[in-house]
Amino acid sequence: MQYVLGRENFAGRTFHVESGVLIPRPETEMLVQWIEEDYNTPICGLLPPAPLQILDIGTGSGCIAITLALDILNSSVAAWDISGDALLIARDNALRLGAKVNFQLQDALSIEATDRCWDIIVSNPPYICEKECEAMAENVLQHEPHTALFVPNDDPLRFYTAIAKLGKKTLTKGGTLYFETNPLYIKEVKTMLKDLGYTMIQLRKDQYDKQRFVKATLL
């Protein structure tokens, strides 16, 4: 229905959606809320901090990046996606909603060297194993982009590992990584992050009481 209407609500705003991007989910709103809880603090007018550097990897419709750009005070937001079509939709949403986001065409699995540093890296990457597709709704399989949904059965953490390794190189001291995950593999994600040297790893449940979100800090 959302593709027919061409829109979906997310965090109090209406986003344009087409078949080239995932439909924003309520679960992902909870991920954004977690970040805002942690970082949306009042700014002292006498000593304004440097803008909070935020990177959203796999932005799709731009719902995460745009919401953070509009809601978090004094932030500078960049967003990557492998799909040029998705970036066109995301840019349109940002323009319509009045958000300043730097969108870039980038593959999370083959990230080029970057000298940028980030305070926050957030991602809701593909995390559904191919073997799980039989249990999924037919309308999802027919209309939503498979590249944004599925990972190989033998490598379910491929995006999480690549992004966590990027974070090791580009997160500022005390910088934080936020993931939406497949509840079936969230313990493996936690172990991977610990093995890479992340600390203060926290898990959070979604509205269905499933462990879905991970937060980890690089000290």
Give a label for each model feature:
Residues 1-73, 77-89, 215:
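SAM-dependent Rossmann-like transferase core, predominantly class I methyltransferases
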Residues 71, 75-76, 80-218:
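S-adenosylmethionine
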